Design a protein with these regions (language model features):
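Bacterial Sec-dependent N-terminal signal peptides
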Residues: 1-21, 159, 267-268, 272-275, ...
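Short, solvent-exposed loop/edge segments of extracellular or virion-exposed proteins
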Residues: 32, 276-287
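Acidic, Ser/Thr
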Residues: 295-296
Length: 296
């Protein structure tokens, strides 16, 4: 009985590879509803950027584009439209902070960010994204560790792909000089796709001490948007994962925690190193220790 109990606790606490088991404060996701033709949106981008600078690695932004004509760069997506309508965005710019309200607020509320950033998170999120550049295959591993019990027996895990550095038109882009160069605007944190279902994959159990690991294989599209789509540059991608508490109406909210997943461009093929040659260094020296050069 003692042995079985010991192994059980080892598996629960030490099986994780990426996520910490220590209590942490909540991170924040700003879902910003924006558009290239929106006259006030560049200022909202600037405000969101300043919040990111204030809370590095704690605040993340997903810019969901609407309010646009289908000209290049067409940043509107079907999934983005579903989220926009469900989260109550009826004007631009507007935002949801951790999906905490029935409808989106105008602009970006730093006040709401400040509230959430001080709260303890019920769960921590970690993981890794490895992309095989040749096949454009992303292998996404997400770990969720529950530091405290969730309010619900079932939560929802969502993984999103965002893209930086998409150049194109932005109404009043000069109001955000950080992203405006020679009349061209650099669109950042652009929502591109959801790897899970729109409102997340169900995860359980959600009680304290539970570790959940999910792995996804995703083929990164060459282009997103129709018509006037945008090339999906692998080097400009980032992936975020967040956990929501429950389904309320058609959407899952509020967000319990969010994290950006580390991103590597590499291969999933196994590597088998072999020794090709071994040679002595300074082999004329008399000593009990030897130095070797090994070619692999």
């Amino acid at each position: 009985l003692f042995t079985a109990t010991l192994l059980y606790h080892v598996n629960r606490v030490f099986a994780q590879q990426y996520v910490t088991t220590e209590p942490l404060l909540k991170n924040v996701l700003i879902e910003e509803f924006t558009g290239r033709n929106c006259p006030g949106c560049s200022q909202a981008h600037l405000l969101a950027n300043n919040i990111i600078k204030k809370y590095p690695k704690r605040v993340f932004v997903s810019n969901i584009y609407g309010f646009d004509t289908p000209t290049y760069p067409n940043l509107v997506t079907q999934e983005g439209n579903i989220i926009t309508h469900a989260l109550g965005a009826t004007a631009y710019p507007s935002s949801q902070i951790n999906r905490s309200k029935d409808s989106a607020d105008l602009g970006v509320s730093e006040h709401d960010v400040n509230l959430f950033i001080k709260q303890e998170a019920p769960c921590n999120i970690g993981g890794l994204v490895v992309v095989d550049e040749l096949s454009r295959t992303a292998t996404i591993t997400v770990e969720i560790y529950y530091v405290h019990d969730s309010d619900n027996d079932v939560n929802y895990l969502t993984v999103e792909m965002l893209q930086d550095s998409i150049w194109g038109y932005q109404n009043n882009g000069m109001n955000n000089p950080e992203q405006y160069v020679d009349g061209n605007y650099c669109h950042m944190h652009v929502f591109r796709d959801i790897i899970t279902s729109t409102w997340g994959e169900t995860i359980s159990p959600t009680n304290e001490g539970t570790l959940i690991t999910k792995t996804y294989t995703y083929i990164i599209p060459e282009i997103i948007g129709d018509p006037s789509g945008v090339d999906v540059n692998i080097n400009h991608l980032k992936f975020i994962a967040f956990v929501t508490n429950e389904m309320i109406g058609a959407e899952s909210r509020p967000i319990l925690n969010v994290a950006r997943l580390p991103f590597l461009i590499g291969t999933q093929e196994e590597v088998f190193p072999c020794i090709d040659d071994i040679s002595y260094k300074d082999n004329s020296m008399c000593s009990n220790s030897k130095s070797f050069t090994i070619d692999m």
